[in-house]
């Protein structure tokens, strides 16, 4: 046994502590926090790094707390229940910042504060509980060893009740050895769909349970059986058969209606997904209705495409997976957006040049690629197309930074990055980036002072968009640029001449309502523009 004292100086991709071992190698220590001094047992060694286990915390961080889950440290579902939630948001922002500087090569990129959950527990609408040798629970971190569960703080209450029901029932089931997983979906209305997965044709045995299930789980509206393929890649890899109730689960997202089957892809945290989509639309310049034409280069089943179509004149979604395009077209029909959203089956890298050649133009493009990032050919196609605004949605900071670097080399500027916490208590972070095309024919680098711009020190501290975003996040309503300008003038913050004023001498200018004035004043104080 090798025990060392380690000073933790950073965090890894799963929010594990990172420090230096005695020989200088990086050591990853789950459960340790930046700034802490911990006694660590080295449990795994590699040529360039090692992994350790906390034996004792010698100097604790102020952000440390007692984990609130009895399975934490054994179950692999959470990485960060030993720290305050606010600390996880700071570390996720830092992870995005570090990726953009170290991998993207940027100097002081604008990375906003992470948008966290109002309530970080019970956020997920889908659960996959593995069943192994007749017992149900979750997999241990990094293995397929089962950890029995009676609760999961990530999941909604109906899913937990289903978990407990099967935990009690499994010992008496003759088919228990063939069952492999229980998958639950719970919509915003609290209704639940159950899918029982097995490696043998035991659907008739599950059908016998329906009267008890319906009696004991009042939220239940749909039950499916899934016979898994011989070597399944995931729990739902197989053929579904409907046993009882509704064939689809109704759900809403961004004022859109969707019907979900057991195998449908859908965001697992709809509240945060809406905030993510709002950021993506903001980056695409779609904060309100416009005549913009937008491209969605990885449209999937069309959730972001249709959210954009609510505000843009026309959106074209491109996706290479045939079932996803079929679902996207049906979702557009269901929401009455078929006339504003068109979907193309194909590789976006090949389809973009075709669209441009046929006279199509785009004011903005939205990219939401898989974890591996965007295809190089797609990025090159976007660069050649010269689309002025890119809204890049990423689930991996490293591949995001790599792609941003390529886009910058192609003439784009990174304006800002907005981390969003879609998966509380884990190391995962979603990020939205706004990249704008720099027309080199019309731009040169110059150095000017605030005096030359007639810009006051107070005015320079926050942009109108930052003030708008602050008010929307804190108060839940939007404020116009005109109202902000009125309140800034009222506070003595000098605006540039005629800024935001009508050119008509007799124009009637709407006055900022009291509640919006109070919100704007709060924002000005937050940004230290007024005392």
Please describe what each predicted stretch is.
Residues 1-71, 339-342, 350:
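Terminal RNA-binding accessory module
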Residues 2-7, 13, 201-456, 464:
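Rossmann-like S-adenosyl-L-methionine
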Residues 17-22, 137-142, 328:
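Short, acidic/hydrophobic/Gly-rich beta-strand patch recurrent on exposed beta strands
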Residues 55-67, 73-177, 203:
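Extended interfacial segments that mediate partner engagement and assembly in macromolecular machines
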Residues 461, 509-531:
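Phospho-regulated, low-complexity intrinsically disordered regions of nuclear gene-regulatory
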Residues 463-475, 485-491:
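DNA-recognition alpha helix
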Residues 495-505:
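Short Lys/Arg-enriched helix C-cap and helix-to-coil transition segments
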């Amino acid at each position: 046994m090798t025990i060392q004292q380690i000073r933790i100086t950073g965090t890894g991709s799963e929010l594990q502590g990172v420090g230096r071992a005695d020989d200088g190698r990086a050591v990853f220590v789950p459960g340790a926090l930046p700034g802490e001094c911990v006694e660590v047992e080295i449990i795994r060694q590699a040529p360039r790094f090692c992994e350790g286990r906390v034996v004792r915390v010698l100097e604790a961080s102020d952000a440390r707390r007692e984990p609130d889950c009895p399975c934490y440290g054994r179950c692999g579902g959470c990485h960060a229940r030993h720290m305050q939630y606010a600390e996880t948001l700071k570390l996720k922002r830092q992870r995005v910042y570090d990726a953009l500087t170290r991998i993207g090569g940027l100097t002081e990129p604008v990375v906003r504060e992470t948008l966290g959950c109002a309530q970080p527990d019970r956020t997920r609408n889908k659960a996959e509980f593995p069943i192994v040798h007749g017992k149900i629970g979750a997999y241990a971190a990094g293995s397929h060893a089962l950890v029995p569960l009676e609760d999961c703080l990530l999941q909604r209450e109906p899913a937990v009740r289903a978990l407990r029901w099967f935990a009690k029932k499994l010992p008496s089931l003759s088919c228990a050895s063939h069952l492999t997983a229980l998958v639950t979906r719970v919509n915003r209305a609290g209704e639940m769909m159950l899918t029982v997965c097995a490696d043998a044709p035991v659907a008739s045995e599950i059908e016998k349970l329906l009267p008890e299930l319906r009696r004991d789980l009042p939220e239940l509206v749909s039950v499916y059986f899934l016979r898994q393929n011989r070597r399944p890649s995931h729990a739902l890899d197989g053929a579904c058969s409907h046993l009882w109730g509704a064939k689809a689960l109704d759900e809403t997202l961004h004022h859109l209606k969707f019907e979900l089957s057991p195998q449908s892809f859908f965001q697992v945290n709809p509240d945060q997904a809406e905030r993510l989509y709002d950021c993506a639309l903001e980056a695409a310049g779609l904060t309100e209705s416009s005549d913009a034409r937008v491209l969605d280069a990885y449209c999937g089943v069309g959730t972001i495409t249709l959210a954009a179509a609510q505000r843009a004149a026309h959106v074209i979604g491109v996706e290479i997976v045939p079932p996803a395009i079929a679902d996207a077209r049906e979702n557009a029909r269901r929401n009455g957006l078929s006339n504003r959203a068109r979907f193309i089956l194909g590789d976006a890298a090949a389809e973009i040049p075709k669209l441009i050649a046929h006279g199509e133009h785009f004011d903005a493009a939205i990219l939401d690629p898989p974890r591996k990032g965007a295809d190089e050919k797609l990025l090159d196609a976007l660069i050649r197309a010269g689309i002025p605004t890119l809204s890049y949605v990423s689930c991996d900071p490293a591949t995001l930074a790599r792609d941003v670097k390529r886009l910058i080399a192609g003439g784009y500027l990174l304006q800002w990055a907005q981390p969003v916490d879609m998966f509380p208590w884990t190391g995962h972070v979603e990020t939205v980036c706004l990249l704008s095309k720099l027309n080199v024919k019309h731009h040169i680098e110059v150095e000017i002072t605030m005096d030359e711009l007639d810009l006051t020190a107070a005015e320079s501290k926050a942009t109108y968009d930052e003030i708008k975003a602050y008010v929307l996040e804190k108060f839940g309503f939007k404020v116009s640029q005109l109202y902000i300008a009125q309140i800034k003038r009222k506070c003595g913050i000098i605006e540039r001449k005629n800024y935001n004023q009508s050119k008509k001498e007799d124009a009637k200018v709407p006055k900022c309502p009291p509640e919006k004035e109070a919100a704007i004043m709060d924002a000005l104080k937050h940004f230290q523009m007024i005392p």
